[in-house]
Amino acid sequence: MLKTDVVVIGAGPAGSMAAKHAALGGANVVLIDKKSEIGTPKRCAEGVYDEGFKWLNIEPDERWIAQRIYGATLHSPDGNSFTVTSEDVPVQGFILERKVFDKHMAMDAARAGAKIMIKTLVTDIKRNENGFILSCDSIEGTIEVEAKIAICADGPESIMAKKLGINSTTPQNMMSCAQFEMCNVDYNDDEKIEFYLGQDVALKGYAWIFPKGNGVANVGLGVTGNTDKTAYEYIMDFIEKCPATKNAQPIEMNIGGDPINGLIEKIYDDNLLICGDAAGQVNPIEGGGIIEGMLGGMAAGDVAAKAIKEENYSKERLHEYYEKYSELSFNLIETLPAARDIVYSFTDDEYNKIISVANTIDLKNISKRDVLKVVFKLPPTLTTKLIKLLKIVFPKQMKSILF
């Protein structure tokens, strides 16, 4: 039997961050992943904002950056578009090469002192007097791992968390996603990501083209709600109709679920922490979860290491993880579901009006009050929705403007 202080299940970005920070904090750590190659297959559109890496104290590395991004274009259902650049809004980002990025994050965990076990499937986890016993199937046969603290980072609707009595099921708002990595994509600018809105494009969701340079891009979409069409059927229709993809050819396909419901009911318990997609640490509006999950992993690892030093693994001690994550994520994962519901209630006509009005704004010379003036030019029902949305997303700014 292998004995350790902390075991992390899943070597995605969140799990690797948890393992890294637990090891940096002095704990003995084992990081387990069921795949024979960390990072494959990729699970997302690979887009991140650069500010997130500053929060994580990670220096961007050209080896895992496919493309730097300096702007975004939103396409409305009627064919109009609105573009914002980093000159207008001080936000930049990257399109990652996840197969490289995930490996580097795992290597950082190893350099911090974590032991990595690949092609090892955790088949069962049970409590004992010391914490947990994990049963694992590996290439060397069946092995057992005993740990004082377990960190579940095993993806949406965590199987291991369920085995421990945690309700990790996403009851609703599981975004169904389909994506192709494609070549010969005719995008206008490889430094801008593109979003396509409309119920025919993606019901209660959106489609995206994330360029990776040299005509290569991730082309995908996510849908929510009740629909007779699958995400795969939606993406095939989109690729056929979108001018940018009419000559594109697929080189990889990814299909899966994205939990945009917000945090699960419980992300910690006695001897247990849950992070990443397993915890619902995903932006409820746009479905991004790389940075959000890594912040969760960093918080989980830090708290686990301190708990090991104190020899206190109770849920009362591990509650610090919840507080730390809420602080690091600005509590957005808990507040944004209400904003998501507003965004996904927009009709095609409302999207058309929003994009049309947005094009009247001079982003380089506009105040917060000017934004409200533009919003009030819209139909009353849409204005009400947007005011509610702005109050949720920018509560402090809206309070200072309105009161």
Curated annotation (Swiss-Prot):
Pathway: Membrane lipid metabolism; glycerophospholipid metabolism. Binds 1 FAD per subunit. One of its GO terms (biological process) is membrane lipid biosynthetic process. It is an enzyme of class 1 (oxidoreductase). GO terms for molecular function: flavin adenine dinucleotide binding; geranylgeranyl reductase activity; oxidoreductase activity, acting on the CH-CH group of donors, NAD or NADP as acceptor. InterPro entries: DGGGPL_reductase, FAD/NAD-bd_sf, Geranylgeranyl_Rdtase_fam, Geranylgeranyl_reductase, GGR_cat. GO terms for cellular component: membrane. It comes from the Archaea. Keywords: FAD, Flavoprotein, Lipid biosynthesis, Lipid metabolism, Oxidoreductase, Phospholipid biosynthesis, Phospholipid metabolism. Its cofactor is FAD. SUPFAM superfamilies: FAD/NAD(P)-binding domain (SSF51905). FAD binds at residues 14, 33, 44-45, 47, 98, 122, 277, 289-290. Reduction reaction proceeds via syn addition of hydrogen for double bonds. This is Digeranylgeranylglycerophospholipid reductase 1.
